[in-house]
């Protein structure tokens, strides 16, 4: 199964757009509401649906292997 990472806007705060990928996807810097650190990635509601999975908890996750954006912790 693909590795998917939490990417639902409802789980994030301090969301700042920092750029776009080559394919035109918005790239954001953000913090998770319930987790320490600052991360870089996408918002699940803005990307192709084939890269979005819905977890058992009802929140979206993203299969980053289908995107030209890397998810990473930056702080």
Provide a role label for each language-model segment.
Residues 2-75:
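C-terminal intramolecular chaperone/autoprocessing and neck/assembly modules of extracellular spikes
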């Amino acid at each position: 199964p693909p590795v998917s990472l939490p990417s639902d806007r409802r789980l994030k705060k301090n969301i700042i757009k920092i750029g776009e990928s080559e394919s035109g996807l918005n790239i954001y810097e953000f913090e998770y509401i319930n987790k320490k650190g600052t991360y870089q990635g996408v918002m699940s509601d803005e990307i192709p649906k084939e890269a979005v999975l819905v977890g058992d908890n009802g929140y979206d996750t993203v299969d980053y292997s289908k995107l030209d954006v890397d998810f990473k912790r930056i702080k």
